């Protein structure tokens, strides 16, 4: 077994121009945490190397925060992973044009696999695919619809050359009930591509458990940070000393 460093991605979810957190990804469950740019700059100041930035309005198909999102990306000096509503060439190009280091494709990977294949061919590892899961069923369209069987889609995306997956247990997202480590192990058992974990982190011990899963390179942390369960410096300290196995 070897020591590994888990990359932490503090989340900034944007709805109607505000930084918010949802419970189980449901529209209408938002808790507001103020200005998205201020939140992103706080995470940068606290030591983040990545920020997970989500346009929830675009994800739910109810508009977008494109100008604000672009301002956040421009204003920080850390890498940004951008997600929400990226479903065609125009939205992909707009997301990449913000300067985001990486973009997450979700629904489109389920609904338009041919386009995703072409997008991966075109921009390579700047694309990660978000696999949002209930049990082993994928959730689409802002988590409001079923989108196919996890392992079938994963096999297809591996064959298409997808470089990275962001795996979210929808039932645990925003709930502070702990991550689904079994789900992460089941995914990393069938793909050699790196995985970023998302959903349910509530304590520093959860990050240690995630970091111990071989094949998981990062974890998105949202509500636990906003709710004060721990600080980002505390999280960075524990995830730089974990042994994988």
Curated annotation (Swiss-Prot):
The organism's place on the tree of life at top rank: Bacteria
Subcellular locations according to the entry: Cytoplasm
Active-site residue numbers: 13, 132
Keywords for this protein: Amino-acid biosynthesis, Cytoplasm, Histidine biosynthesis, Isomerase
Functional pathway: Amino-acid biosynthesis; L-histidine biosynthesis; L-histidine from 5-phospho-alpha-D-ribose 1-diphosphate: step 4/9
GO cellular component term, pick one: cytoplasm
Pfam families: His_biosynth (PF00977)
Catalytic class of the enzyme: isomerase
Chief localization: cytoplasm
Catalysed transformations (reactions): 1-(5-phospho-beta-D-ribosyl)-5-[(5-phospho-beta-D-ribosylamino)methylideneamino]imidazole-4-carboxamide = 5-[(5-phospho-1-deoxy-D-ribulos-1-ylimino)methylamino]-1-(5-phospho-beta-D-ribosyl)imidazole-4-carboxamide
BP-aspect Gene Ontology terms: L-histidine biosynthetic process; L-tryptophan biosynthetic process
Any one GO MF annotation of this record: 1-(5-phosphoribosyl)-5-[(5-phosphoribosylamino)methylideneamino]imidazole-4-carboxamide isomerase activity
Record-given protein name: 1-(5-phosphoribosyl)-5-[(5-phosphoribosylamino)methylideneamino] imidazole-4-carboxamide isomerase
Natural source organism: Frankia alni (strain DSM 45986 / CECT 9034 / ACN14a)
Protein's gene: hisA
């Amino acid at each position: 077994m070897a020591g590994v460093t888990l990359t932490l991605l503090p989340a900034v979810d944007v709805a109607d121009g505000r930084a918010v957190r949802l419970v189980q990804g449901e529209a209408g469950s938002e808790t507001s945490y103020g200005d998205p740019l201020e939140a992103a700059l706080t995470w940068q100041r606290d030591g983040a190397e990545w920020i997970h930035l989500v346009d929830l309005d675009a994800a739910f198909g109810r508009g977008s925060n494109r100008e604000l999102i672009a301002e956040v990306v421009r204003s920080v000096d850390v890498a940004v992973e951008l997600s929400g509503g990226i479903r065609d060439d125009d939205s992909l190009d707009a997301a990449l044009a913000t300067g985001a280091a990486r973009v997450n494709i979700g629904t489109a990977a389920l609904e338009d696999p041919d386009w995703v294949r072409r997008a991966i061919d075109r921009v390579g590892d700047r694309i990660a695919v978000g696999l949002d899961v209930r049990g082993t069923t994928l959730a689409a369209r802002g988590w409001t619809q079923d989108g196919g069987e996890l392992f079938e889609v994963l096999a297809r995306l591996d064959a298409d050359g997808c470089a990275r997956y962001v795996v979210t247990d929808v039932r645990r997202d925003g709930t502070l009930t702990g991550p689904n480590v079994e789900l992460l192990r089941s995914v990393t058992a069938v793909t050699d591509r790196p995985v970023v974990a998302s959903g349910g982190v509530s304590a520093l011990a959860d990050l240690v458990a995630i970091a111990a899963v071989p094949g998981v390179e990062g974890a998105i942390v949202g509500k636990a940070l906003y709710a004060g369960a721990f600080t980002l410096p505390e999280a960075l300290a524990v995830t730089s000393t974990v042994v994988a196995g």
